[in-house]
């Protein structure tokens, strides 16, 4: 019952967030400098008659008041109609379907690679606390967090194209972007796994298992793995949402025909429907992914369900920031 209430609450929250995103995007597009009519006519304003400009504006509905334009936009949105591109005249939904797969592929591949690398490294760092292995992993994690993704991408491009003289579409448009995005994501997960595991190694349940003669491998798999990984789920939701939104820079850097590339191209041409569609796509996936992450945490963590059923109950689950500061 509490889970159903939580799902309904998240659904209402998602609707409100998407409404705010769509409205803010509409307002920002109307306040931004430039005129899409100039781009559509592909002519200098001095060479186009006023009648042609007004006819084009009437056709696009740009002569209506802002309130009327907003109402038409929201009405179409409720019917899952994002309009047509000013440039290509294609439906925006079709354009998004053409560009979205590569963005989603890179984002989810980055997530898988990050998990496969960061969880083992976080466990190794915790098990070898304050040894040279732990110190090396911490230094690499700190560097990965400190360096911007676009800077890492530029370095990788320079190494592959200039120093190694490798010309491969798969390498430049898939493997390198995944590596670039994975480095920063791995760093956060490694630090979280390490700090959670260090804290759990001092818990009573671990001490009791050791007294019963259980080996360290058994303790890690049966006693520590689930409580270590559970706090990662909310972070994964935030990180994956950020990945989809953050591909704008990476896709333009590596010349990848994804949503980020489409968004930048549409901004240059003042293609309002496509811009609004891209922003809504990114916002929708960010909200959906975070909602799924919250529900998974609720389903897998009994403490969260207990606290949801009785808000007066306070769980003893430590905050991520506190545990990170304690074992950093």
Curated annotation (Swiss-Prot):
CDD domains, alphabetized: TM_PBP2
Phenotype upon loss of function: Deletion of the nikBCDE operon strongly reduces nickel transport and urease activity. Mutant shows decreased virulence in a mouse model of ascending UTI.
Annotated InterPro entries: BPD_transp_1_N (IPR045621), MetI-like (IPR000515), MetI-like_sf (IPR035906), Opp2B (IPR050045)
Chain ranges of the ABC transmembrane type-1 domain: 100-297
Pfam families per the UniProt record, alphabetical: BPD_transp_1 (PF00528), BPD_transp_1_N (PF19300)
Protein location: Cell membrane
UniProt main location, coarse: membrane
One cellular component (GO) term of this entry: plasma membrane
Induction comment: Transcription is stable during the exponential phase and increases only in standard conditions in late exponential phase.
An example molecular function term from Gene Ontology annotations: transmembrane transporter activity
Bilayer disposition of the protein: Multi-pass membrane protein
This protein's UniProt keywords: Cell membrane, Ion transport, Membrane, Nickel, Nickel transport, Transmembrane, Transmembrane helix, Transport
Transmembrane segments: 11-31, 104-124, 139-159, 170-190, 229-249, 279-299
Function: Part of the ABC transporter complex NikABCDE (Opp2) involved in nickel import. Probably responsible for the translocation of the substrate across the membrane. Required for full urease activity and plays a significant role in the virulence of S.aureus during urinary tract infection (UTI).
Family stated for the protein in its record: Belongs to the binding-protein-dependent transport system permease family. OppBC subfamily.
Self-association state and partner proteins as the record states: The complex is composed of two ATP-binding proteins (NikD and NikE), two transmembrane proteins (NikB and NikC) and a solute-binding protein (NikA).
Protein name: Nickel import system permease protein NikB
Organism of origin: Staphylococcus aureus (strain NCTC 8325 / PS 47)
Lineage start: Bacteria, Bacillati, Bacillota, Bacilli, Bacillales
Record gene name: nikB
């Amino acid at each position: 019952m509490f889970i159903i209430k939580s799902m309904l609450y998240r659904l209402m929250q998602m609707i409100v967030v998407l409404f705010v995103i769509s409205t803010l995007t509409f307002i920002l597009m109307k306040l931004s400098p430039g005129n899409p009519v100039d781009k559509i006519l592909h002519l200098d304003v001095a060479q186009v008659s006023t009648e042609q400009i007004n006819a084009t504006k009437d056709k696009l509905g740009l002569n209506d008041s802002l309130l009327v334009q907003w109402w038409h936009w929201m009405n179409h949105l409720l019917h899952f109609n994002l309009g047509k591109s000013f440039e290509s005249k294609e439906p925006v939904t079709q354009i998004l379907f053409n560009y979205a797969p590569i963005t989603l592929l890179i984002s989810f591949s980055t997530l898988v690679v990050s998990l496969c690398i960061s969880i083992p490294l976080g466990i190794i760092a915790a098990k070898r606390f304050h040894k040279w292995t732990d110190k090396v992993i911490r230094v690499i994690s700190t560097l990965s967090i400190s360096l911007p993704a676009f800077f890492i991408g530029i370095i990788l491009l320079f190494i592959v194209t200039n120093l190694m003289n490798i010309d491969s579409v798969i390498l430049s448009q898939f493997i390198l972007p995944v590596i670039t995005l994975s480095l920063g994501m791995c760093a956060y997960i490694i630090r979280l796994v390490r700090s959670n595991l260090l804290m759990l190694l001092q818990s009573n349940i671990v001490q009791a298992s050791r007294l019963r003669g259980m080996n360290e491998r058994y303790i890690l798999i049966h006693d520590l793995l689930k409580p270590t990984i559970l706090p990662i789920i909310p972070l994964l939701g935030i990180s994956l949402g950020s990945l989809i939104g953050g591909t704008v820079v990476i896709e333009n850097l590596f010349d990848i025909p994804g949503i980020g590339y489409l968004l930048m191209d549409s901004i240059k041409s003042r293609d309002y429907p496509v811009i609004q569609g891209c922003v809504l796509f990114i916002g929708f996936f960010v909200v959906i992914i975070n909602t799924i992450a919250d529900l998974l945490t609720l389903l897998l963590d009994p403490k969260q369900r207990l606290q949801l059923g009785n808000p007066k109950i306070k769980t003893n689950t430590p905050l991520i920031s506190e545990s990170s500061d304690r074992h950093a």
